[in-house]
């Protein structure tokens, strides 16, 4: 199964900005690696929450569309809330 995720670059960074994103149904994320600078992103939470449940999501090469530009990435790490059904943050590594 192939995954295509739509993301947008984040302007506001930090704890408060991340909390505001989560309240708005978004998910803070970062993509890094391949000799390029790290880019802070925001994604739709529900899309990622349902994708994280599938084992192949964690091992597949994903297509991440950042403001119209496509990048090949893999999931490097993600954080779940201790008791809520909520993804808190996800890291992607460029392939």
From Swiss-Prot:
The keyword Membrane does not apply. One of its GO terms (biological process) is translation. The keyword Acetylation does not apply. InterPro entries: Rbsml_bL25/Gln-tRNA_synth_N (IPR020056), Ribosomal_bL25/Gln-tRNA_synth (IPR011035), Ribosomal_bL25_long (IPR001021), Ribosomal_bL25_short (IPR020055), Ribosomal_L25_dom (IPR029751), Ribosomal_uL5_bac-type (IPR020930). Part of the 50S ribosomal subunit; part of the 5S rRNA/L5/L18/L25 subcomplex. Contacts the 5S rRNA. Binds to the 5S rRNA independently of L5 and L18. This is one of the proteins that binds to the 5S RNA in the ribosome where it forms part of the central protuberance. Belongs to the bacterial ribosomal protein bL25 family. This is Large ribosomal subunit protein bL25. It comes from Chromobacterium violaceum (strain ATCC 12472 / DSM 30191 / JCM 1249 / CCUG 213 / NBRC 12614 / NCIMB 9131 / NCTC 9757 / MK).
